[in-house]
Amino acid sequence: KNESIGIKYWDTSGSNNWARPATLNTELNGAYLNNYATIAQNMIGNAKYYLGGYNGSNVTADTIYQYERKISGGGTYYYGTNPNSWVGKVALMYLSDYGYAASEECTKTLSNYNDLTCISNNWLFDKNYQWVLFQNPYRRYTVYRVVPDGNYGNLNVYENLYNVRPTLYLTSSVKI
């Protein structure tokens, strides 16, 4: 969704485990999804969402993508016993989605996306804080968000209300 459905906490109990489920997961796959007619709900398919994370900066969208899916060369991807994926209907955009949404002219690492070339040509850029589906693997209560200047950072899941832009996948039978 290219607009926020409002500002919300990622999780009110202080866990970065989306599959537990996190407060935001419960809301998106409950009240938010139930606002749509049954015919629309049936167009949304179950999808596998990857829950990997990273603790650091100066990385590209490609590197973030690999950590989300645990396909990079090594490192810590998840906090404790957090699962590496979750199957469901509605989640948040990946941090790599945000990185890939910038035009080819943006050659910066994601922590330097506050560059005008990166934000002016990124259709997912919004001048507001927005949650993404990306955890800090070293702290059970920390996830990432995109910040108003265009780059990203991590924050405790229960401290701030940020914008939520739901992500979903349509079933293969949907005709557009």
Predicted regions and their residues:
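Collagenous Gly-X-Y triple-helix signature in extracellular proteins
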Residues: 1-176
